[in-house]
């Protein structure tokens, strides 16, 4: 934590960094963080997607003046976080989950980009595409086989964990609400736009 722990006369709340390691006795139970098969379904576990769960959008729209104000808006529910994480682990044991990525940093959209692999892209339908940028620590993007949807739905409902289906894995393309995007254009903008703006 910086000794000068404030900016613009507003204090910056300290953020402890915790490093963790774990052990796994069965290599077959380790899930991929990359898409596995074209045609599989994509689900989001956790709360419903909402704009106010994106700190960057709130700042961009002047709804929150800084990250500190956003942090005050989002109240942690550690019990729910553990419940969702436990469900992910159990579904992994049941071999329902083919791949998985959390949405705690960068939201659903960044998780989907990270999960792209080889010639596999994704097609999703979201009522408001801005919701793709919402992020929270108790949320996960998971890939499941079509035939496992009923079992996954029953398991999550029984354990009180929300979920919703957002799309499927397709060949190469990125489609959001039927609009196509180029993966390499997105990555190029992500890495280079800031430099263009400040020059």
Model-derived segments and their meaning:
Residues 50-75:
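Gly-rich Lys/Arg/Thr-decorated short loops/hinges at beta-loop-alpha junctions or inter-strand turns
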Residues 76-83:
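C-terminal transmembrane module of polytopic alpha-helical membrane proteins
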Residues 1-54, 165-168:
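Glycine-rich anion-binding loops of enzyme active sites
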Residues 26-38, 58-62, 83-91, 125-130:
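Glycine-/acidic-rich phosphate or pyrophosphate-binding loops and their flanking alpha/beta elements
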């Amino acid at each position: 934590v910086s000794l000068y722990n404030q900016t613009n006369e507003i204090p910056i709340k300290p953020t402890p960094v915790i490093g963790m390691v774990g052990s796994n006795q069965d290599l077959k139970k380790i899930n991929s963080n990359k898409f596995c098969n074209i045609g599989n379904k994509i689900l989001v576990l956790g709360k419903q997607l909402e704009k106010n769960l994106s700190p960057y959008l709130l700042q961009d729209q002047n709804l929150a003046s800084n990250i500190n104000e956003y942090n005050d808006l989002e109240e942690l529910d550690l019990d729910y976080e553990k419940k969702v994480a436990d469900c992910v682990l159990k579904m992994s044991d049941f071999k329902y989950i083919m791949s998985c990525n959390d949405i705690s940093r960068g939201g659903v959209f960044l998780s989907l980009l990270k999960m792209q692999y080889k010639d596999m892209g994704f097609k999703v339908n979201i009522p408001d595409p801005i919701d793709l940028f919402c992020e929270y620590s108790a949320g996960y993007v998971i890939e499941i086989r079509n035939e496992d949807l009923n079992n996954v739905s029953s398991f999550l409902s029984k354990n009180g964990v929300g979920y919703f289906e957002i799309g499927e894995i397709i060949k190469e393309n990125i489609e959001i609400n039927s609009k196509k995007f180029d993966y390499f254009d997105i990555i190029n903008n992500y890495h280079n736009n800031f430099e263009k703006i400040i020059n």
